């Protein structure tokens, strides 16, 4: 981008935490992004570009806050654990994380429509900054979802608009066939991360089974208690 100074750009990075969830950090200057990456991310990064870090989500947020930045949770609700609203984070931890960041992504072109609706509702409830993104891994995706604001055509001005709640989001999801093709292409290019990703999938599946089983047991206990005390309203 240094060759095209007349094109407004925003330096940013998407990071995968130790838990497997994603976070976006946007910076006001390229030098800030470079320093953040070299000092706080690269030493804890796996060998592949798609590898997760060894840092927890809280540690990443803490490091990002050391710089002038805008911190966003992308696709907070999605199919697996890449969004922060998943079973790897209990309610208390999730609430603390959502309080710590600047905002959430409310429309993601690669996400499923019903999950985007939940993301949009979350954004309204939090009353924080909102963004949208194409999650573009090919030219077809670019521009499917955009974030816009009435501000100067500079990166810092756009970041300020987002942070101050002056940004709007418009767009729609790509079709299912395109989603499948995009996911397949990413897996082929980054096959080296399969072992780590498989491990995360297994751990998350175990977590889902554990939580769902506990919920079912709780519901059965409650049903049994109500049936047992049906004729004893004072008990």
Locate the predicted segments by residue.
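Extended substrate/RNA-proximal surfaces in nucleic-acid metabolism proteins
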Residues: 1-105, 201-234
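Short, aromatic/basic amphipathic alpha-helical patches
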Residues: 1-3, 118-122
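Histidine/acidic-residue-rich catalytic or RNA/ligand-binding cores of hydrolases
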Residues: 19-24, 82-92, 114-117, 139-152
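Residue-level recognition of alpha-helix initiation/capping sites
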Residues: 55, 113-114
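C-terminal functional module detector
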Residues: 58-70, 121, 126-129, 134-235
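Short acidic/polar capping segments at secondary-structure boundaries
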Residues: 76-79, 109-111, 137-138
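Structural recognition of alpha->loop->beta junctions
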Residues: 87-111, 147-163
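Acidic/histidine-rich catalytic cores of soluble enzymes
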Residues: 104-113, 122-123, 141-142
